[in-house]
């Protein structure tokens, strides 16, 4: 199945698994990616070393696109934002905040960014940052 989303994200199906805290770890994300959708690892307020381990494990288990969900209200959001760049995560989804201050760095790193935002106005501002 080919759609604009599958072309953009490099997946077989236009589906993205939710970044559910305490459930969406490397095992689930890699299984979803191996099935043809986009699996997500929940960043939440995970310690940096733990999330780094989950990202690396996911890379070992799949060659397909996967991502990390970052909750921007997390006290370590800045560190998580840098970690996905350092680990070359292909896709980032965000929630619970405005991802504007990270967009340029993520885009420069080649990361596909999918912000979940509360308003059309903010969505348009994020679109302008592509």
What are these regions, as identified by a protein language model?
Residues 1-130:
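Active-site entrance/lid segments in N-terminal catalytic domains of soluble metabolic enzymes
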């Amino acid at each position: 199945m080919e759609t604009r989303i599958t072309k953009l994200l490099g997946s077989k199906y236009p589906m993205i698994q939710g970044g559910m805290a305490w459930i969406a770890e490397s095992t689930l994300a890699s299984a979803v990616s191996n099935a043809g959708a986009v699996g997500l690892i929940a960043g939440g307020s995970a310690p940096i070393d733990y999330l780094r381990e989950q990202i690396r494990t996911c890379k070992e288990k799949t060659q397909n696109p996967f991502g990390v969900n970052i909750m921007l209200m997390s006290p370590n959001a800045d560190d998580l934002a840098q970690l996905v760049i350092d680990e070359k995560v292909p896709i980032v989804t965000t929630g619970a905040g405005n991802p504007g201050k990270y967009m340029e760095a993520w885009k420069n790193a080649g990361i596909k960014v999918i912000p979940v935002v509360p308003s059309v106005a903010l969505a348009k501002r994020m679109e302008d940052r592509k």
